[in-house]
Amino acid sequence: MKRNNSKKVRVEPTRRPKKNPLKARGIEAVDYKDIETLRTFISERGKIRSRRVTGLTPQQQRQVATAVKNAREMALLPFTSR
Protein backbone atom coordinates (compact mmCIF):
# COMPACT_ATOMS: atom_id res chain seq x y z
CA MET A 1 0.00 0.00 0.00
CA LYS A 2 1.23 3.45 -0.87
CA ARG A 3 1.44 6.13 1.81
CA ASN A 4 0.99 9.80 1.26
CA ASN A 5 3.94 11.49 3.00
CA SER A 6 3.00 15.04 2.09
CA LYS A 7 1.78 17.11 5.00
CA LYS A 8 -1.33 19.17 4.70
CA VAL A 9 -0.72 22.88 4.92
CA ARG A 10 -3.25 24.67 7.03
CA VAL A 11 -4.46 27.87 5.45
CA GLU A 12 -5.75 30.39 7.94
CA PRO A 13 -8.48 32.70 6.73
CA THR A 14 -7.58 36.36 6.74
CA ARG A 15 -9.13 38.40 9.49
CA ARG A 16 -11.39 41.24 8.55
CA PRO A 17 -11.15 44.36 10.68
CA LYS A 18 -14.03 44.71 13.09
CA LYS A 19 -16.74 47.15 12.22
CA ASN A 20 -16.81 49.97 14.71
CA PRO A 21 -20.40 51.20 15.16
CA LEU A 22 -19.43 54.52 16.76
CA LYS A 23 -16.95 55.34 14.02
CA ALA A 24 -19.57 54.47 11.38
CA ARG A 25 -21.96 56.99 12.95
CA GLY A 26 -19.24 59.62 13.21
CA ILE A 27 -19.36 59.76 17.02
CA GLU A 28 -16.10 60.51 18.83
CA ALA A 29 -17.32 60.92 22.41
CA VAL A 30 -20.32 59.09 23.84
CA ASP A 31 -22.94 61.31 25.46
CA TYR A 32 -25.36 60.01 28.09
CA LYS A 33 -28.13 62.18 26.61
CA ASP A 34 -27.95 60.41 23.23
CA ILE A 35 -30.46 57.69 24.11
CA GLU A 36 -30.91 56.34 20.57
CA THR A 37 -27.22 55.51 20.29
CA LEU A 38 -27.05 54.04 23.78
CA ARG A 39 -30.01 51.73 23.13
CA THR A 40 -28.00 49.96 20.43
CA PHE A 41 -25.52 48.84 23.11
CA ILE A 42 -28.17 47.57 25.54
CA SER A 43 -29.88 44.19 25.36
CA GLU A 44 -33.64 43.68 25.53
CA ARG A 45 -33.26 42.88 29.22
CA GLY A 46 -31.50 46.18 29.89
CA LYS A 47 -27.95 44.83 30.20
CA ILE A 48 -24.94 46.48 28.61
CA ARG A 49 -23.72 44.33 25.72
CA SER A 50 -20.13 43.08 25.71
CA ARG A 51 -17.34 44.31 23.45
CA ARG A 52 -17.36 41.04 21.59
CA VAL A 53 -20.99 41.64 20.59
CA THR A 54 -20.81 45.38 19.91
CA GLY A 55 -17.38 45.54 18.27
CA LEU A 56 -16.23 48.55 20.28
CA THR A 57 -12.68 49.31 21.36
CA PRO A 58 -11.89 49.00 25.09
CA GLN A 59 -11.89 52.77 25.54
CA GLN A 60 -15.23 53.14 23.73
CA GLN A 61 -16.74 50.30 25.77
CA ARG A 62 -15.81 52.12 28.99
CA GLN A 63 -17.34 55.33 27.64
CA VAL A 64 -20.55 53.53 26.68
CA ALA A 65 -20.77 51.78 30.07
CA THR A 66 -20.29 55.07 31.93
CA ALA A 67 -22.81 56.85 29.69
CA VAL A 68 -25.41 54.10 30.19
CA LYS A 69 -24.93 54.24 33.95
CA ASN A 70 -25.27 58.02 33.94
CA ALA A 71 -28.39 57.83 31.76
CA ARG A 72 -29.90 55.32 34.19
CA GLU A 73 -29.20 57.63 37.12
CA MET A 74 -30.82 60.53 35.27
CA ALA A 75 -33.86 58.30 34.52
CA LEU A 76 -33.31 58.51 30.76
CA LEU A 77 -32.87 54.74 30.52
CA PRO A 78 -34.53 52.09 32.68
CA PHE A 79 -32.40 49.94 34.97
CA THR A 80 -34.28 46.87 33.75
CA SER A 81 -36.97 46.21 31.20
CA ARG A 82 -39.61 43.60 31.78
Swiss-Prot record:
**GO cellular component labels:** cytosolic small ribosomal subunit
GO molecular function terms attached to this record: small ribosomal subunit rRNA binding; structural constituent of ribosome
- Record-level GO BP terms: translation
Family matches, as InterPro entries: Ribosomal_bS18 (IPR001648), Ribosomal_bS18_CS (IPR018275), Ribosomal_bS18_sf (IPR036870)
Q: Does the keyword RNA-binding apply?
A: yes
Q: Where is this region: Disordered?
A: 1-21
Q: Which domain of life is it from?
A: Bacteria
Q: Which Pfam families match?
A: Ribosomal_S18
What UniProt keywords apply to this chain's record, in alphabetical order? Ribonucleoprotein, Ribosomal protein, RNA-binding, rRNA-binding
**Which NCBIfam families does the record match to this protein?**
S18
Quaternary structure, per UniProt, is: Part of the 30S ribosomal subunit. Forms a tight heterodimer with protein bS6.
Q: What family, per the record?
A: Belongs to the bacterial ribosomal protein bS18 family.
How is this protein named in the record? Small ribosomal subunit protein bS18
Lineage, broadest ranks = Bacteria, Bacillati, Actinomycetota, Actinomycetes, Mycobacteriales
